[in-house]
Design a protein with these regions (language model features):
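Small cysteine-rich, disulfide-bonded extracellular modules of the LU/uPAR three-finger superfamily
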Residues: 1-103, 108-124, 130, 136, ...
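Beta-rich carbohydrate-recognition modules and glycan-binding surfaces
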Residues: 115-277
Length: 311
């Protein structure tokens, strides 16, 4: 039987622990590792903001925002009244300049055996207000309200009864290697009940873009969109024939309800590779914290993953 837990400590004192689920991939990975079929022993710990319950068929964190290599791996063997216990232990340290609300944590191998230029990644973490502008070249304001990734969100505000778009110019990027089964997700903070929907646009020129919509008519507070398949994005091409291999700008449109104005705090936008197969790479373990752990700048936090092996 495999059991594991993640332990968070500060200044040598434990501040939190959370039990994990070893995934189906994790069980295969460990079996292959013992058999000598996996040579690279290095691991990463990943941290995210999604609180969806962990299950053994998880293939990734719900919404990852930070990943760091394991600094130290060892074993721990001791006996108690219940017999001898065997542990594999991985340790790392969250740096002082990291800020975020940790709701989930997972373990991955550090490397793939196959090359993949279209991996899961951030499109934007909305950390730079000067990178975004509206049609009049005004930058959005920063706000600490609702921030899960970093210390702030960017406040995107609509007009009164009219939609408003914010743009971010990026280095021309080729998204053509992502399949229709891959997905994007948006993390945001809904400040009011005046929001009708959010549009996300991927531009290959000033007039040619792909578009998806997030309809939101329920409550306020922190939100993570459902997985939006890229098949939906590709189907949302406008009539100007956009080119998915030459994306150079991202647009986000805030659409308010009739006669109202809405402000949305933008927190993170990710693209997730859902269907690339690598027999030596995947999510080994995932844990969802029952109470989120807030990591603030200026504070070192030690993280330890202890996997118990029963023979």
């Amino acid at each position: 039987m495999l059991k594991g837990r993640y332990i968070f400590s500060e200044n040598g004192k434990e501040i939190y622990r959370s039990e994990n689920v070893v995934t189906l991939y994790g069980k295969r990975f460990l079996t292959n590792f013992i058999a000598g079929n996996i040579i690279d022993y290095r691991k990463d710990l990943a941290f995210g903001i999604d609180s969806t319950a962990a299950v053994d068929n998880d293939t990734r964190l719900g919404f990852e925002f930070y990943r760091i290599p394991v600094e130290f791996g060892t074993t721990d063997i001791y006996s108690d009244d219940n017999g001898i216990k065997y542990f594999v232990v991985y340790k790392t340290v969250l740096p002082v300049d990291l800020a975020g609300v940790i709701k989930e944590v997972g373990t991955y191998p550090s490397r793939r055996t196959s090359s993949n230029s279209f991996d899961s990644k951030f499109i934007s973490d909305f950390s730079d207000s000067f990178a975004w502008r509206d049609s009049e070249s005004f930058n959005p304001e920063r706000s600490s309200t609702g921030a899960l990734i970093g210390e702030d969100v960017l406040s995107f505000t609509s007009g009164v009864g009219t939609e408003k778009e914010y743009f971010c110019t990026i280095t021309e990027s080729d998204f053509s290697g992502y399949s229709v089964n891959d997905s994007i997700r948006l993390s945001y903070y809904k400040n009011d009940n005046n929001l009708e929907k959010i549009k996300i646009r991927f531009y290959s020129s000033d007039i040619a873009y792909y578009e998806v919509e997030i309809n939101d008519n329920s409550g306020t507070g922190n939100k993570i969109s459902d997985d939006i398949l890229l098949s939906v994005l590709y189907a949302g091409a406008n009539s100007e024939n956009p080119d998915i291999s030459k994306i150079n700008k991202i647009g986000i449109v805030v659409v308010p309800k009739t006669g109202l104005q809405s402000t949305v705090g933008m927190d993170g936008l990710r693209i997730n590779d859902e269907d690339s197969f690598d027999p030596t790479y995947g999510l080994i373990s995932r844990s969802v914290l029952s109470t989120p752990l807030t990591k603030v700048i200026g504070r070192l936090v030690d993280v330890e993953y202890r996997m118990e092996l029963s023979f």
